[in-house]
């Protein structure tokens, strides 16, 4: 090859390489510009409209890094939108309840480090359910568990685990509390945590892991709250709190909270005479609660909360098959919707019920005097007809020979409807079982079903003779 041919060949190769590099730079430039404009757009599947990401509140910010030669291109994927829950779907139509979860905490305590607890409840965020309880600052196989029958100490804290995970040593202590309520507004968790002296307690309002607000005791007599989930609609969360006598008139208030800040307080109004430990559920556009009258009635009070104008209406469940313990036998018990029945009203237990048209679903202890056994059933006309007593779809959850305790409701939003679920506290130890010095619990959880179901009994199941003393 002569010198001229070499020069021509080298020039051709150089020109080809230069052309390729030029085309690559154009491709990189086009890609960069395209991704720059697309990082702020999300395609909306239903109608292919373009929705800007920036003005919305996002849950997570995911960035992918793509390397092309020496050029770095950042592409931001539009994240999942996070919105306040509004609970506007209808209530699911159910035929009864099916088993959902059981934590077996007491049985596991025989050979492991499990917290001593009471006052459990369940609540769900949009994607997952969690179990809560008030811990006693000790595990069961620890001498500090002696005398944990007492409700209020400075060592009690609110525990939170994924539903079905017992409260082990790695459990998160959400706040200091001997009375509590928790709920998720669609964006973050709100925890209402009461602690302090009986005559001057403090309620702390913790939102998204930060203390946002607080309120002190207004009647100087054991400020207390629901011991089950609160409810949030369109960013406004409601919680029922009582301060005052447990056996005479007390001062109940309904607090309205937005992102942890108390924005309004309404006094209880209506015909309810005594209200404690409410079990609340969303009933769009408001919130409905079924509570405990510890003074006059073994029929349960109802508190209806209007989230928009902060108004409150209260009454009593109409069903003549009443839900509290102690109570009269079913043949002689009564309820006429508006007032306490003055039947074994003193004392009581936390419980639940919810309306289904004119009917009512409810749960209660099987024993009329003790926290033993647990049953659920539907009362035809039990929400609207005074002293209605036609019972259908009865189920035994815990047989009458085994202990139960508090129970409460929680709601789960499905694709087309809102399902109602409940938990039952299964208390073990003192005061009834004096062979041991501790008092603690496990839980069992059921949810509404439109299908068929069988029978059974789901007690705590721990052999007290095998337990640490």
Curated annotation (Swiss-Prot):
Residues 11-33 are annotated as: Involved in apical transport and lipid raft association. Its cofactor is Ca(2+). GO terms for molecular function: exo-alpha-sialidase activity; metal ion binding. Residues 1-9 are intravirion. Disulfide bonds join 92-417, 124-129, 183-230, 232-237, 278-291, 280-289, 318-337, 421-447. Its EC number is 3.2.1.18. Residues 91-469 are annotated as: Head of neuraminidase. N-glycosylated. Pfam families: Neur. Its main location: virion. Glycans are attached at residues 61, 70, 86, 146, 200, 234, 329, 402. Substrate binds at residues 118, 152, 276-277, 292, 371. Residues 36-88 are annotated as: Hypervariable stalk region. It comes from the Viruses. GO terms for cellular component: host cell plasma membrane; membrane; virion membrane. Inhibited by the neuraminidase inhibitors zanamivir (Relenza) and oseltamivir (Tamiflu). These drugs interfere with the release of progeny virus from infected cells and are effective against all influenza strains. Resistance to neuraminidase inhibitors is quite rare. It catalyses: Hydrolysis of alpha-(2->3)-, alpha-(2->6)-, alpha-(2->8)- glycosidic linkages of terminal sialic acid residues in oligosaccharides, glycoproteins, glycolipids, colominic acid and synthetic substrates. Ca(2+) binds at residues 293, 297, 324. GO terms for biological process: carbohydrate metabolic process; viral budding from plasma membrane. It is found in: Virion membrane; Host apical cell membrane. Homotetramer. The influenza A genome consist of 8 RNA segments. Genetic variation of hemagglutinin and/or neuraminidase genes results in the emergence of new influenza strains. The mechanism of variation can be the result of point mutations or the result of genetic reassortment between segments of two different strains. Intact N-terminus is essential for virion morphogenesis. Possesses two apical sorting signals, one in the ectodomain, which is likely to be a glycan, and the other in the transmembrane domain. The transmembrane domain also plays a role in lipid raft association. Belongs to the glycosyl hydrolase 34 family. This is Neuraminidase. It comes from Influenza A virus (strain A/Kitakyushu/159/1993 H3N2).
């Amino acid at each position: 090859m002569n010198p001229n041919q070499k020069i021509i060949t080298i020039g051709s190769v150089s020109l080809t390489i230069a052309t390729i590099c030029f085309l690559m730079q154009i491709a990189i430039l086009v890609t960069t510009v395209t991704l720059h404009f697309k990082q702020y757009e999300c395609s909306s599947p239903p109608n292919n409209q373009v929705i800007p990401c920036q003005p919305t509140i996002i849950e997570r910010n995911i960035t992918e890094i793509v390397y092309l030669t020496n050029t770095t291109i950042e592409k931001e994927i539009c994240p999942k939108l996070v919105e306040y829950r509004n609970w506007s779907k209808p209530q699911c139509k159910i035929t009864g309840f099916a088993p959902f979860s059981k934590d077996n905490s007491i049985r596991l305590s025989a050979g492991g480090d499990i917290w001593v607890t009471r006052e459990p409840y369940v609540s769900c965020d949009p994607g997952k359910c969690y179990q809560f309880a008030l811990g006693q600052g000790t595990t069961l196989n620890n001498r500090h568990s002696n005398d944990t029958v007492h409700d209020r100490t400075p060592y009690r804290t609110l525990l939170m685990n994924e539903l079905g995970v017992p409260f082990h040593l790695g459990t998160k202590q959400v706040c200091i509390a001997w009375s509590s309520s928790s709920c998720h507004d669609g964006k973050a968790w709100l925890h209402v945590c009461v602690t302090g002296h009986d005559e001057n307690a403090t309620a702390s309002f913790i939102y998204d892991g930060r203390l946002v607000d607080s309120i002190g005791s207004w009647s100087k007599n054991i400020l207390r709250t629901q011991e089950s989930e609160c409810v949030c609609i369109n960013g406004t969360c409601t919680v029922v709190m009582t301060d005052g006598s447990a056996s005479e008139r007390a001062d109940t208030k309904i607090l309205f909270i937005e992102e942890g800040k108390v924005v309004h307080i309404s006094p209880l109004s209506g015909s309810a005479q005594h209200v404690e430990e409410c079990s609340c559920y969303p009933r769009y556009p408001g919130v409905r609660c079924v509570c405990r009258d510890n003074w006059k009635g073994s029929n349960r009070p109802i508190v209806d909360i209007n989230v928009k104008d902060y108004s409150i209406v209260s009454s009593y469940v109409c069903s003549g098959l009443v839900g509290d313990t102690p109570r009269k036998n079913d043949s002689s018990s009564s309820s006429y919707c508006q007032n306490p029945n003055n039947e074994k009203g003193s004392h009581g237990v936390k419980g639940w019920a919810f309306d289904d048209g004119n009917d009512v679903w409810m749960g209660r202890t099987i024993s009329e005097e003790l926290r033993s056994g647990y049953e659920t059933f539907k009362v035809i006309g039990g929400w609207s007809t005074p002293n209605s007593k036609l019972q259908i779809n009865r189920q035994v959850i815990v047989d009458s020979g085994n202990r139960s305790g508090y129970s409460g409701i929680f709601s789960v939003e499905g694709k087309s409807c809102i399902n109602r679920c409940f938990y039952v506290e299964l208390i073990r130890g003192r005061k009834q079982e004096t062979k041991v010095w501790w008092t603690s619990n496990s839980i069992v959880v059921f949810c509404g079903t439109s299908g068929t179901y069988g029978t059974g009994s789901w007690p705590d199941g721990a052999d007290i003779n095998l337990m640490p003393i």
